[in-house]
């Protein structure tokens, strides 16, 4: 906070001002100017096969390179969830033809700027602020992709124009977003600069055949070249026109799913200058405010002398909120938000808090150690290349005592199947998880050394544990 009165943002003066003292959450909408000026209110995932250009598309739209880690740059693949925010503008001059009247910029760009297109007048005005969740396309990173799907409102499905469609991960990702019930999808036919027109047309037919009968049927297919930034403004236009901003709940107690967490202190920092841990995630509902008391569940997990699991929720206070580089006084549901807390930074370093839920004290859901689920298995394994004409391997039924990987919200944890009948199963979780009855979960099984998506389920009920709270 750059001095001044409490509860008023003063960082980035070119953006809309947020004032906590006059905040009325009942009047906020996902398109309120003071919200979208500083933070994204809609999450769009990028999905598709490895090396089809997902990160490049995000970079073309937002100007942010989502690949942050050295080993990712060297191997040119996304390993962690990347993320980037972009503002989408529309020119207020009606004489300007579409799609040129749409433009995208980084999230700290002013909310209005004059046109630079010859022959037009007026200003580019902010219409949407979107957050991109850039998922890895590698088969071994399917769990990360599912964690990202937990916070998506819509998806961009990337298909490279110079390879046949569908590639293995393309179909696996499409199944994953079908489980997550994502209805809004744009298909981007990328690398169009590398193929002849006839090839592009032929692949267009392949894509149509591939998405028929899936959740992506009828989705617009946009030919683009992410590297040359060709047709990117068309993508912006479609994001504005085809993807509705989901209705948001601003009045409930806030709840945030953590998908990243880190320790922001440099080595050798003086003790007095240490900053608390930072949790990054997407708010599902409610509004978080600077200065608010918060609780993180399940918190610190340990075992007592008898080997029983114990959970100790972490209580803390929000010291700062930010969306990329923009300071916030309050954060609304939607895009990815960084929450600066007073939590011991060692608890947050290197994504240790992923899968936890952060929210108002006393308003978070129960902590489960066992789940009873109704489940549905896929008929065939997806994403595995099969020899020649052989059909993909059938998915075997769940067997008692086998270990599956369970994705709940943004948490991936192991689970042992303790009982199974018809379409109901009981799963004993390796790690306790904070969730609710009715939540969707994804199930994966170890097949030939890789975790493969085999089906999904819904939580019917479960065994909960009471959190232990210190009496101090």
Swiss-Prot record:
Keywords: Acetylation, Cytoplasm, Disease variant, Epilepsy, GTP-binding, Hydrolase, Initiation factor, Intellectual disability, Nucleotide-binding, Obesity, Phosphoprotein, Protein biosynthesis. It catalyses: GTP + H2O = GDP + phosphate + H(+). SUPFAM superfamilies: EF-Tu/eEF-1alpha/eIF2-gamma C-terminal domain, P-loop containing nucleoside triphosphate hydrolases, Translation proteins. GTP binds at residues 51-56, 190-193, 225-227. GO terms for cellular component: cytoplasm; cytosol; eukaryotic translation initiation factor 2 complex; extracellular exosome. One of its GO terms (biological process) is cytoplasmic translational initiation. Encoded by an chromosome X-linked gene which escapes inactivation. Does not have any homolog on chromosome Y. Residues 134-137 are annotated as: G3. The keyword Magnesium does not apply. Residues 48-55 are annotated as: G1. The keyword Acetylation applies. It is an enzyme of class 3 (hydrolase). It comes from Homo sapiens. Residues 225-227 are annotated as: G5. GO terms for molecular function: cadherin binding; GTP binding; GTPase activity; methionyl-initiator methionine tRNA binding; translation factor activity, RNA binding; translation initiation factor activity. The gene is EIF2S3. This is Eukaryotic translation initiation factor 2 subunit 3.
């Amino acid at each position: 906070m750059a001095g001044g009165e409490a509860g008023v943002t003063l960082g980035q003066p070119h953006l809309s001002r947020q004032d906590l003292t006059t905040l009325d959450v009942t009047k906020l909408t996902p398109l309120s100017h003071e919200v979208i000026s500083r933070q994204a209110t809609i999450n769009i995932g990028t999905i598709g096969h490895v090396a089809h250009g997902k990160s490049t598309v995000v970079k073309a739209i937002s100007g942010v390179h989502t690949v942050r880690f050295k080993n990712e740059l060297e191997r040119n693949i996304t390993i962690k969830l990347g993320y980037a925010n972009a503002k989408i503008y529309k020119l207020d001059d009606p004489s300007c033809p579409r799609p040129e009247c749409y433009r995208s910029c980084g999230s700290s760009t002013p909310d209005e700027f004059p046109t630079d297109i010859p022959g037009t007048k007026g200003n580019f005005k902010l219409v949407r602020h979107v957050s991109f969740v850039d998922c890895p396309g590698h088969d071994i990173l399917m769990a990360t992709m599912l964690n990202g799907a937990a916070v998506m409102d819509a998806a961009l499905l990337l298909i490279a124009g110079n390879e046949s469609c569908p590639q293995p991960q393309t179909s696996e990702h499409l199944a994953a977003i079908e489980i997550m019930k994502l209805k809004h999808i744009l298909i981007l036919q990328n690398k169009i600069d590398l193929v002849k027109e006839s090839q592009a047309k032929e692949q267009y037919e392949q894509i149509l055949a591939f998405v028929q009968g899936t959740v992506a049927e009828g989705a617009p297919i946009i030919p683009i070249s992410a590297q040359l930034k060709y047709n990117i403004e068309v993508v912006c236009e479609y994001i504005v026109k085809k993807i509705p901003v989901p209705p948001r709940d601003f009045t409930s107690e806030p709840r945030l799913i953590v998908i990243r967490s880190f320790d922001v202190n440099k080595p050798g920092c003086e003790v007095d200058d240490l900053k608390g841990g930072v949790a990054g995630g997407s708010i599902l509902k409610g509004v978080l405010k600077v200065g608010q008391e918060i609780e993180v569940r399940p918190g610190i997990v340990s075992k007592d002398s008898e080997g029983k699991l114990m959970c100790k929720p972490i209580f803390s206070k929000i010291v700062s909120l930010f969306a990329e580089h923009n300071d916030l006084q309050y954060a609304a549901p939607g895009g990815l938000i960084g929450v600066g807390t007073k939590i011991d930074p060692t608890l947050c370093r290197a994504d240790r808090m992923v899968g936890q839920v952060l929210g108002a004290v006393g308003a978070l859901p129960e902590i489960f150690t066992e789940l009873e689920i109704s489940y549905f298995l896929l008929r065939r394994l997806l994403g595995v290349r099969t020899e020649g004409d052989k059909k993909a391997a059938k998915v075997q039924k769940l067997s008692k005592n086998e270990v599956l990987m369970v994705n709940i919200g943004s948490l991936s944890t192991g689970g042992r199947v303790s009982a199974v009948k018809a379409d109901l199963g009981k799963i004993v979780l390796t790690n306790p998880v904070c969730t609710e009855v009715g939540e969707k979960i994804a199930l994966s099984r170890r097949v030939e050394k890789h975790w493969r998506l085999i089906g999904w389920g819904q939580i019917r009920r479960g065994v909960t544990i009471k959190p232990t709270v210190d009496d101090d």
